[in-house]
């Protein structure tokens, strides 16, 4: 690396401000006030986490006031290796000093070629040998849009099937496939032809039965509706699902349901799209969440962690679906070389340090801790999830129970717990119906001590809540 470039990249000076000099900094309130005055009303996280961040390393972020937080949001699951992993930073510095063009559209480079080989190496055998990849604009929602276009082009059909509670992004087509009504309410007409089926959410069973029956009934309903000539649903261009619903409340799909959906879609010639934007890259204790069921999707959507913390999104699919004409899908920033380099380095570290297995082990520890907390408080209805993608459904024990005897959603209680956790130096998100699920998405490198720190803070928050209610 040239000396002048090395000096610039190692400097903490940005636009004339020394980012590390306390005397040059204003406080959180200063930056939050400026953000409120200048940024869109659509901003969300600063309303729950009122901080201006200065630095980050591993699982820890530090604000401009010098207070540190253990980050169990991690860029909504983007930061598999945590913040600023030294090997990823070194890789980025090497690329910046190499003279490699950073913006290549869909022209190839050695960095891109390696990334494609690396990501294909993570695929199950039934897809790896016949896979094609499309680089998209660098967000998961654009990759979902690309997958929709791919399926419509390949099948000549237009209808789409999604599931209640689904989240696939915020652009027009993706929003049409979202279960949550809130973001759609003021948008008006979305893409027509989207049909929603029950997802196997056993705790709030859509059939009023619960337990293992939920998956069986959901699978039977799905198959009968798609095979019914009087069912009112045209054979769709694709079925899209999450093997673990994330924003929908951290709801893992049972393997028998996933297998049934795969069998039906294969029998009917319907491409199956699995959205692994949040659940992929080892988070659930498998590299892909769908692998627990032993199924092979036709299309896999990836973003978030696949770019090593930088913006990148891809669609991987069976080559027989590749009926696009040249230029049928594009995106100016689909050639993000820094993200591809960071992605390759991230995949290398995940494999070398066995972080997929670590996610499974760490997830079991965290889940066991959460279940112990749940056993001691009436405010937790269920602990669920896989690996380091876990959710705690908060309930209101004073409310009227549902048909299954479960207390109603405790959205206000969940917000209180989230606030208490933030005060204790833990960042975690809420989601699910009415925002009543505490969601934990820490980096895969979280230590046992950090897991116990999170668990201890959560136990203390619920204990304080119980004392106030007594």
UniProtKB/Swiss-Prot annotation:
Reported cofactor(s): pyridoxal 5'-phosphate
Which GO annotations describe the biological process of this protein? rhizobactin 1021 biosynthetic process
Q: Which organism is it from?
A: Rhizobium meliloti (strain 1021) (Ensifer meliloti)
Q: Keywords, A to Z?
A: Aminotransferase, Plasmid, Pyridoxal phosphate, Transferase
Identification of the protein by name: Diaminobutyrate--2-oxoglutarate aminotransferase
Q: What is the lineage of its organism?
A: Bacteria, Pseudomonadati, Pseudomonadota, Alphaproteobacteria, Hyphomicrobiales
Q: Which InterPro entries match?
A: Aminotrans_3, Aminotrans_3_PPA_site, Dat, PyrdxlP-dep_Trfase, PyrdxlP-dep_Trfase_major, PyrdxlP-dep_Trfase_small
Family designation: Belongs to the class-III pyridoxal-phosphate-dependent aminotransferase family.
Which molecular function terms from Gene Ontology are attached? diaminobutyrate-2-oxoglutarate transaminase activity; pyridoxal phosphate binding
